[in-house]
């Protein structure tokens, strides 16, 4: 399992998460950041520093943002 960046990131794109990620698995997209699920080590460092609380462990993404799990995976299939 990995962490997922959800809707609150859109329009904010604060790079605090990128700066603290020890494995550089967070990538910038057009509208938000994305976490590479194949590289994420589940350390949670990104979740703690997100100023808009947009980052959740995949198992705990709120129901209204569950679609971001697939959106995140699809970003890395390109």
Curated annotation (Swiss-Prot):
Cofactor: [4Fe-4S] cluster; [3Fe-4S] cluster
Residue stretches making up the 4Fe-4S ferredoxin-type domain: 2-29, 31-60
Keyword Iron-sulfur: yes
Domain of life: Bacteria
Keywords: 3Fe-4S, 4Fe-4S, Electron transport, Iron, Iron-sulfur, Metal-binding, Repeat, Transport
GO molecular function: 3 iron, 4 sulfur cluster binding; 4 iron, 4 sulfur cluster binding; electron transfer activity; metal ion binding
InterPro entries reported in the protein's UniProt record: 4Fe4S_Fe-S-bd, 4Fe4S_Fe_S_CS, 7Fe_ferredoxin, RnfB_subfamily
Residues involved in [3Fe-4S] cluster binding: 9, 17, 50
Binding site for [4Fe-4S] cluster: 21, 40, 43, 46
UniProt keyword Iron present: yes
Textual note on the cofactor: Binds 1 [4Fe-4S] cluster.
PANTHER family assigned: FERREDOXIN (PTHR42859:SF2), OXIDOREDUCTASE (PTHR42859)
Subunit structure: Monomer.
Protein name: Ferredoxin 7Fe
Organism annotation: Hydrogenibacillus schlegelii
Taxon lineage: Bacteria, Bacillati, Bacillota, Bacilli, Bacillales
